[in-house]
Each structure stands twice: as C-alpha cells, then as structure tokens.
A protein has these predicted regions:
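Extended, well-ordered protein cores
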Residues: 1-129, 138-141, 154-161
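Non-transmembrane, aqueous-exposed alpha-helical and coiled segments at domain scale
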Residues: 77-78, 87-88, 99-121, 134-473
C-alpha cells in the first residue's frame, strides 16, 4: 500500500530528536534536503518533491532524490537562536544516519560501512543539496562528510563556501526567467523593454523570488504575499519600485514590512496576514479585479492568486493551484487549503513556477486548457539542480588530480571560482533549449500525435514513465 511513485531506495532515520527520510530514484541520484515543518506527513511532502525532481533531473545524468527531516523537540520558533541551533544539530544527526549506512570509496575500492549487515550491491553515490530551511547548511553537511572520511569530500553538498552560491548567482531565478521570457515572446512582449504587471508569491529576502523580481527593470509588481504580509502597489513607478526591491534584497532578513511606504502608489500598502480584515481602496480593488471593499486576509490571498495580471510568479513554498475536480485533501498541503484556487479560476496570462509544487499537474492542465501559458516546476526551476550537478562533477573530476598531488586544493578552488560565469551560461542554455523544445512540440501539427503516443507507450513499457502518476492520456 505504499503510495506511488515508489523510490528505488529509501533510508529512514529515527532518533528521539529528529526523524527523517531520504528517497532516491536510482543509484546515481541527486536532490536537496528539506527542513520540514510537516511533522505528521513529511514523507508525503518529500514524495511529492522527489516526483518533481525525477522530471527536473532529465536535463542531467543523475535521477531524482529528495530528503527531509522534522524536529521532534523543537524550541519555540520565537527563540530564533535556540531554534536554529536545534535545527542544525538535528540536520547533522540526519546526515550521520544517512552516512552510517552508505558505502564509501577508499583508494578506488568500495568499502561498506562498519557494523552494517549489507544485503545490497555496492552503492556509494550519495549527494545532497540545499532546500527549504537548509539554504546555508552546505558547509555543515560537508563538515559531516569530512568527519566520516566520505569519498566525495566537499562535493557531498553543493553550494558551500567553496562552491557555486545559488543565491549569489541567482541561477534558479535566472533559469525560471528564461521560461518567462519565452512565454511573453509568444504574446509578442519583450519583458526586458516593456512594462508588465506581476502578482508574486514570496518576499525579497528569498533566493528565487528576490532574484526573480530583479531580472527586469520593467516589472510592475502590483500585489504579492508571503507567510507574514500582503503587499499591494496598484500603479508602481517602475524605476523607483525596482530600486526599493533591490534595497530589500540586500537587506538581511527583510520582509515586505521593510518596504518604504512613501514609495507605494495611491491605494496600496503593506498588511499583516494576522489582521482580522483588510480594507481595500478603489485602486487596490481595480488591480486585483474584485468589488469587495473589505476582505479577511485568506480571502484576499485567494483574490490575489486570481488577479488579472500578466504574470503570476511563484517563489514560495506551498501548492496554491489545483484542478476544479481535485479535493484539497488530494493536494497534500494543509497550510494552503484555505486559499488555494482552481486552474480554471486563474486570470493571469502566464504562470512562472520558481518554487516547487506550486500547482498540481491537473491544475496546470486546467489552466493551460483555458489558454494560460505554463510549463511545470520541473522545467522552470531546473537551473538550481543543473548548476549543482556541474559543481559536483567538476569536484569529482578534480578530486583525483588533487589526491595525486598534481593540483593543490587552493588551485582547485580558484579554478572552480573562475568557471562561475561559464557554468551559469551552460545551465541557462539548458533552460533556453528545453523551453524551446516544449514550444516546438506544442506547435507541431496533430498528425504527430501518433508518434508521441507510441513514444509514451514505449517509455511506459521500459519502466521510465508512469502515465497515471504524470496525468498523461
């Protein structure tokens, strides 16, 4: 009775302080580790993420993996330092649990872990990456890897201090922006020269949202929300709002409440999601496309998701769009149940999925069938894992050279740093071409459907595809 998709390998880590799971689709797999807050159903969350990761990793050699852990005795979140300290300690425990049962490579030979009864074949490839809650933990993970003498060294967790910093590079958002630009080219709009309206999910301190909202100087961010605030700016001054978003991005731990209120256009403002209700000006009502003069925050969030804007840009955590025939329980994200909308209710022209699992697949299909332009999270935000894979492969390649004494660690690090721009270019090239391939496939004549049908049947017959899971015909 295990729900599909069934991973090829699963490691479950259990202790009085932490519980976690790591799912892999194959022997060579990669994906991030999430600090989950879903104590009751974190495996469901990780399973959904690994499903998206499997598709996302089509652009690289490793198949998808995903891990997640929950704290069992967490201090109150209000005590930030104690909460973070417990999170880091539990993260280390979780990683130790994974490495305790993972084979190592010593001088070219696979060495099974001590005190483990092993029934499987050699299986030493285990790499991890940052995800929600663990964005700054790569060095910690590589420290655990070093303690274990693990063969991958600092290639175990990509994106550390000696690696490609995704937020600094803005690589995930830049990859998603390739999808945005292509969608708008379909509409005859150049996002880099023409103003366009945006509704956003996230805030400027985040990697994917913060970097994304700085990728065009012509963004008119009219509404946005995160887990704390709702931001409304009905008629933003493009240049001044861009500069203010840049300031917030550079401000450590900023929130929408830090936005300079004097720069917000008439009828706008920043409102706490904890308010009982929010009064809406005529200007705010016009840009959101509603008539109600006052709404509770959750109803307002629902209205924002349905706003008649050019672009809905998701840089947040959660599933906000489903199909009309799906129930909230089927979606598996209780935190967003109260304001989730149907794909048929979206009024934006384009959806960009910088965040994972923002829509269910049926929700995407329903939105696309009514004329909306959307790819999937696996397409839009694949640049992050693509960049990590480049880093790990370069480190593995150079590891042997360093070990042989033909390259010092400092020389290796300098070489890695010097390749940053080139790696970024190669990754974005993948984003450009995979969206191009999808658009070409979409515009092919109907008579090629027979070939696509045969391809799907062949993929399914060779166990590379499950049409039911992917909601394919």
């Amino acid at each position: 009775g295990v729900p599909e998709p069934k991973p090829l390998f699963e490691i479950w880590v259990y202790s009085p302080r932490v519980e976690g799971v790591h799912l892999r689709g194959g022997k060579v797999a990669r994906g991030g580790l999430r600090w989950s807050d879903r104590r009751e159903d974190f495996r469901t969350e990780i399973l959904g993420l690994v499903k998206a990761q499997q598709v996302k990793n089509t652009v690289i050699v490793p198949v998808g993996s995903k891990g997640g852990f929950v704290l069992k005795n967490a201090p109150p979140a209000s005590d930030r330092d104690a909460y973070m300290a417990e999170g880091i300690a539990c993260y280390k425990l979780f990683l130790s649990g994974l490495l305790d049962v993972t084979d190592n490579v010593v001088k070219g030979s696979v060495v099974p872990p001590a005190d483990v009864v092993r029934h499987d074949v050699d299986d030493p490839y285990l790499v991890v990456a940052a995800d929600k809650g663990t964005a700054t933990f790569s060095d910690i993970a590589n420290g655990v890897s070093a303690d274990y003498g693990f063969w991958l060294g600092d290639a175990f967790a990509s994106g550390g201090s000696v690696g490609y910093d995704h937020k600094k590079m803005g690589i995930t958002a830049r990859g998603a922006w390739e999808a945005v630009k292509r969608h708008f080219r379909t509409l005859g709009v150049n996002t880099q020269t023409t103003p366009f309206t945006v509704a956003g999910i996230g805030d400027m301190s985040g990697d994917v949202f913060g970097n994304g909202m700085l990728l065009s100087e012509h963004i008119q961010l009219v509404v946005a929300f995160d887990h704390r605030h709702i931001f409304i700016d009905p008629t933003p001054d493009v240049a001044r709002s861009f500069a203010e978003r840049q300031r917030l991005f550079n401000l450590p731990r900023s929130s929408w409440d830090d936005y300079d209120k004097s720069l917000i256009s008439k009828g706008g403002g920043v409102y706490p999601r904890s308010a009982k209700s929010i009064a809406l000006s005529p200007e705010a009502r016009a840009v959101i496309g509603i008539t109600a003069e006052e709404l509770p925050p959750l109803e307002l969030l629902k209205a924002i998701l349905q706003a008649p804007v050019d672009l809905l840009y998701n840089g947040g955590i959660g599933t906000y769009v489903k199909a009309s025939f799906e129930t909230h329980a089927q979606v598996g994200d209780k935190a967003s149940d109260a304001f989730r909308v149907n794909g048929s209710e979206l009024r934006c022209k384009v959806v960009a999925e910088g965040g994972n699992l923002g829509c269910t697949q049926n929700g995407r299909i329903e939105y696309a069938q009514k004329g909306g332009l959307i790819y999937t999270d696996a397409i839009d935000n694949s640049a992050g894992v693509d960049c990590s894979d480049h880093e790990v492969n370069i480190k593995i390649l150079l590891g042997g050279v360093v070990e042989a004494g033909d390259l010092t660690l400092k020389q290796r690090n300098d070489l890695l740093a010097s390749m940053t721009d080139e790696v970024g270019h190669l990754v974005l090239q993948d984003n450009y071409y995979q969206t191009q391939a999808l658009d070409i496939a979409t515009h092919r004549p109907l008579y090629v459907l027979d070939g696509q049908q045969r391809l799907m049947q062949w993929l399914e017959g060779s166990k590379r595809l499950n049409r039911a899971i992917e909601f394919l015909p």
